[in-house]
């Protein structure tokens, strides 16, 4: 906080007195996880937003609410559907390596023809 006050003196009189940094959750493919857990009926997941939680939260919440109410996704949500991960993805080493890679690319420039 002291460093922030040094850079922006106006913060001394602002209402901000404490900064809080929360943990982020990233997924192996960089897409968030949404939908009913395949192994647990009526248990819905909305997680792993890869730092897009605020930006995607409203739409993801609406989509999941419709999913719960209508017993299925309201439109094609396969890119974020929890079912896209299966037994082959249970390998902890693979998940860790892919998640680190997704995190590392999160803020990079999205160039055309760049390999994933």
Name these PLM-found stretches.
Residues 1-102, 108-114:
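C-terminal catalytic lobe of FAD-dependent flavoproteins
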């Amino acid at each position: 906080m002291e460093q922030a006050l040094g850079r922006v003196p106006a913060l001394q009189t602002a209402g901000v007195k404490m900064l809080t940094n929360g943990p982020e959750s990233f997924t192996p493919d960089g897409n968030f996880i949404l939908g009913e857990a395949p192994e647990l009926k009526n248990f819905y997941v909305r997680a792993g937003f890869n730092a897009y939680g605020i930006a995607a939260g409203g739409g993801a919440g609406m989509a999941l609410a419709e999913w719960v109410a209508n017993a299925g996704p309201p439109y094609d949500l396969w890119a974020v559907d929890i079912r896209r991960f299966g037994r082959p993805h249970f390998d902890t080493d693979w998940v860790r390596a892919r998640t680190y890679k997704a995190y590392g690319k999160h803020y990079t420039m999205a160039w055309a023809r760049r390999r994933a």
